[in-house]
Amino acid sequence: MTDTKQLFIEAGQSQLFHNWESLSRKDQEELLSNLEQISSKRSPAKLLEDCQNAIKFSLANSSKDTGVEISPLPPTSYESLIGNSKKENEYWRLGLEAIGKGEVAVILMAGGQGTRLGSSQPKGCYDIGLPSKKSLFQIQAEKLIRLQDMVKDKKVEIPWYIMTSGPTRAATEAYFQEHNYFGLNKEQITFFNQGTLPAFDLTGKHFLMKDPVNLSQSPDGNGGLYRAIKENKLNEDFDRRGIKHVYMYCVDNVLSKIADPVFIGFAIKHGFELATKAVRKRDAHESVGLIATKNEKPCVIEYSEISNELAEAKDKDGLLKLRAGNIVNHYYLVDLLKRDLDQWCENMPYHIAKKKIPAYDSVTGKYTKPTEPNGIKLEQFIFDVFDTVPLNKFGCLEVDRCKEFSPLKNGPGSKNDNPETSRLAYLKLGTSWLEDAGAIVKDGVLVEVSSKLSYAGENLSQFKGKVFDRSGIVLEK
């Protein structure tokens, strides 16, 4: 333990021990134990170096770089499903075949709390107000059940790896237990935690303290998924289960097509090692990350990084050249994860976020609740590994926004991306499936179609000719 203390002092963090003599023996041990947990993963000197590098990286990327060549993905890497039902059917068959062989697993990023939604629960527990009152977790679980039903002769259980965070882990597990895992086998679900990183002062040279025995810490961003996969030995679990393909998505999109056979089939057909879904930008100036190439390497660029001229540029078909909006929905070949995971964890850059961080001042012994940003939180971005994948092994599939993307970011009554927009998108999609199946739906009527009944509009022929003349109906299996 004394080695831990020395490690932090040598890294210039003697302020952490300013009140050492006034701490009780128990508090001294607790402080050292907490510091050792942090330093066992990354030395304090390395963390401080990472923060300094992130500050430099931020300064270097704070303006539009005219020396960088930004282009759309080439046709060999980019394909649209819009108006392309023949290809969609082909990919569906390929993906469903892989699911039937037990080769597909799903990773869900579900570490967020529903704070902005006015809820203290994990975001996945949130009820968007459907007639069925189903939560996001239940909707997603039932999509897996439906897929398993479609290959039931194979007796497949799709492994579901759910990444939580320190604040949401216990509540998430309890929620699944209370609901009997929504009909899934408990053994096919694995919970694991996202990592955390210490917070720094604005100079990036000192750690901030939460209280006399703890550093202030925060989640390490969606890019922390890779280190979490490594530290929780998921690759070894993929091997044990015979998994070859991994589908990754975020909890807050009610339209997510979990373990999407079409997307998986797209990657298999073209031999892609990493693939991502995109939705078409609504207009040239929609503030959304764009999937593109930077100096002929795949990447995601922020809207703020490109000039107005480039944002508005159109191709020969009159479409925006840069139109592939990022929805953080990925495919990974397990062989890629085995090969590159270590180097990703070692080499991925950190990004800084200046935040108002409640802190304890060990010199004065006082707590501060700042009204202005007083510190730096570090985070990693999941797409920062894209440029390590050869362009011919990287794919992007454009999907229909109305069918696949309705994020839940903001609370009830807000301008967009709220429970109302999510609920409407979900009900409209199910209702459109019924109409496609030959049902007669009166104007203004919306029907909820359970994910257990239909995954993507199939299995609804029994409603042909049936009249739906009121909203609030839930069609269950």
Swiss-Prot record:
- Which Gene3D superfamilies does UniProt cross-reference here? Spore Coat Polysaccharide Biosynthesis Protein SpsA, Chain A (3.90.550.10)
- Reaction(s) catalysed (UniProt annotation): N-acetyl-alpha-D-glucosamine 1-phosphate + UTP + H(+) = UDP-N-acetyl-alpha-D-glucosamine + diphosphate
Give residue numbers for the modification (Phosphoserine): S218, S461
Query: Which cellular compartments is it found in?
Result: Cytoplasm
Q: What is its main location?
A: cytoplasm
UniProt entry keywords in alphabetical sequence? Cytoplasm, Nucleotidyltransferase, Phosphoprotein, Transferase
Pathway of action: Nucleotide-sugar biosynthesis; UDP-N-acetyl-alpha-D-glucosamine biosynthesis; UDP-N-acetyl-alpha-D-glucosamine from N-acetyl-alpha-D-glucosamine 1-phosphate: step 1/1
Quote the EC number.
2.7.7.23
The highest taxon in the source lineage is Eukaryota
**What InterPro entries does this protein map onto?**
Nucleotide-diphossugar_trans, UDP-sugar_pyrophosphorylase, UDPGP_fam
> Any remaining note in the record?
Present with 5480 molecules/cell in log phase SD medium.
Which protein are we looking at? UDP-N-acetylglucosamine pyrophosphorylase
